[in-house]
Amino acid sequence: MATDNDSFPWDQDSILSSDMFSATSTELCYENLNRSCVRSPYSPGPRLILYAVFGFGAALAVCGNLLVMTSILHFRQLHSPANFLVVSLACADFLVGLTVMPFSTVRSVEGCWYFGESYCKLHTCFDVSFCYCSIFHLCFISVDRYIAVSDPLTYPTRFTAFVSGKCITFSWLLSTIYGFSLLYTGANEAGLEDLVSALTCVGGCQLAVNQSWVFINFLLFLIPTLVMITVYSKIFLIAKQQAQNIEKMSKQTARASDSYKDRVAKRERKAAKTLGIAVAAFLLSWLPYFIDSIIDAFLGFITPTYVYEILVWIAYYNSAMNPLIYAFFYPWFRKAIKLIVSGKVLRENSSTTNLFPE
């Protein structure tokens, strides 16, 4: 992400000849074109490794989130307002794996953008939009979990399908409008005309964002993050108190089984814990990138290119992490995967399969 800083010595030739990570030689992205960007290709070994690592991340994001969406949408037992939020979150991560990561793989490994100027801007819009869409979804999911844990008996009447739909609509609309309007209006480049001119070359896809918009980007990340941290802190305090109450009651009464309220509370606490881990994974993935964007915006591109690329791909890999988290913590998801992969979902009445242990 490019930013404006008067004290930083921007030189057009040095920008066009800057290399990506450590490379073996210097070439042009388009040998027969004037104003072609310079590329510094990797040797075959590192290239193969990078393609494998980045390609695996993209494939995992696509296939893993597709399994999440298929599981929840197919099996009626999983149809709930909370799970509809999870499906929508998986859709955003799926689109990152489908429309962003494959093209970023080529750009990161080859050091050039070969997909045209139009898709460069569209690719960046997808990147920005789906990132913020995930943030907003996770924020709403944390609020949903708070309601479920704090008052599990009245939760179904408070967080309905209609409320879930409004949260989903808000997340997609706001993130899409922000991402596309920011880049297609050129507001991000205001005051950076000289820098944009210096960065422009055939085979490049650099995003120039001025300090004001970098700060706005960070706020759009920070505010939902603070909400999530606050809400999950309250959730775990409530969960701890509930666990102590249940233990105290168990000692006072010899019950053969837990009450309905206790079972519901236990289930909601487990769901909150799992989704809390998903939120923590998201923050650990994206926070370094956003901090780095602030540093670069106000200190003038002090981050080495290879460090920036690493931070970007750590953030991208978050789109592949949620399905792994669900698979590790949710027995119903593992069972759903087996039914989908084995083709048993094609059988009649498979949508009514019981995925929860008795």
Curated annotation (Swiss-Prot):
The keyword Membrane applies. It is a multi-pass membrane protein. Residues 69-83, 144-166, 234-274, 334-358 are cytoplasmic. Disruption phenotype: Mice lacking Taar2, Taar3, Taar4, Taar5, Taar6, Taar7a, Taar7b, Taar7d, Taar7e, Taar7f, Taar8a, Taar8b, Taar8c and Taar9 show no visible phenotype or behavioral deficits. They however show an absence of aversion to low concentrations of amines such as 2-phenylethylamine, isopentylamine, N-methylpiperidine and cadaverine. Belongs to the G-protein coupled receptor 1 family. Olfactory receptor specific for N,N-dimethylalkylamines trace amines, such as N,N-dimethylcyclohexylamine. Trace amine compounds are enriched in animal body fluids and act on trace amine-associated receptors (TAARs) to elicit both intraspecific and interspecific innate behaviors. Ligand-binding causes a conformation change that triggers signaling via G(s)-class of G alpha proteins (GNAL or GNAS). PANTHER family: HISTAMINE RECEPTOR-RELATED G-PROTEIN COUPLED RECEPTOR, TRACE AMINE-ASSOCIATED RECEPTOR 7A-RELATED. This is Trace amine-associated receptor 7b. It comes from Mus musculus (Mouse).
